[in-house]
């Protein structure tokens, strides 16, 4: 098995994108949303690059992340993905990649309690 600490930021973000999206989709469905268009529209408030960049900025400002999580964020943010953001500038896109890397890292290290705590924190901030 590979050491998760050696996985590059883009791979962690790839994992984190799927994991965070799954938690958000579950949350929205459990709130009673069932129509695909409404689900997609609402999910965007949580999972878009702009939303994730805002959330990670708040996490850093409020010192929510551990030292290790900040390190993972920076690794994801600073990795050159060679892809272009669809609806965000480069800085926003990189910040959201860092956000997703943190989610991916927590999932890959099976730190689900911490992952779910951060997801809940994000939901509260978006719905606040």
UniProtKB/Swiss-Prot annotation:
Cofactor: Mg(2+)
CDD domains: RIBOc
Coiled coil: none
Subcellular location(s) per record: Cytoplasm
EC number: 3.1.26.-
Alphabetized UniProt keyword annotations: Cytoplasm, Endonuclease, Hydrolase, Magnesium, Nuclease, Ribosome biogenesis, RNA-binding, rRNA processing, rRNA-binding
The keyword Transmembrane is assigned to this record: no
Active site: 17
Pfam families recorded: Ribonuclease_3
Gene Ontology cellular-component annotations: cytoplasm
Single Gene Ontology MF annotation: rRNA binding
Keyword Magnesium recorded: yes
Record GO biological process: rRNA processing
Subunit structure: Homodimer.
Its biological purpose: Involved in correct processing of both the 5' and 3' ends of 23S rRNA precursor. Processes 30S rRNA precursor transcript even in absence of ribonuclease 3 (Rnc); Rnc processes 30S rRNA into smaller rRNA precursors.
Database matches in HAMAP family: RNase_Mini_III
Family of this protein: Belongs to the MrnC RNase family.
Name of this chain's protein: Mini-ribonuclease 3
This protein's encoding gene: mrnC
């Amino acid at each position: 098995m590979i050491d998760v600490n050696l996985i590059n930021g883009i791979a962690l973000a790839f994992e984190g994108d799927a994991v965070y999206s799954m938690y958000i989709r579950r949350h929205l469905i459990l709130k009673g949303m069932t129509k695909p268009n409404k689900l997609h529209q609402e999910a965007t408030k949580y999972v878009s690059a702009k939303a994730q960049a805002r959330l990670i900025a708040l996490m850093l400002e409020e010192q929510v992340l551990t030292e290790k999580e900040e390190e993972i964020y920076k690794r994801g943010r600073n990795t050159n993905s060679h892809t272009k953001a669809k609806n965000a500038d480069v800085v926003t896109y990189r910040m959201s990649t860092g956000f997703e890397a943190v989610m991916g890292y927590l999932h890959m290290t099976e730190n689900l309690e911490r992952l779910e705590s951060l997801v809940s924190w994000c939901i509260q901030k978006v719905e606040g």
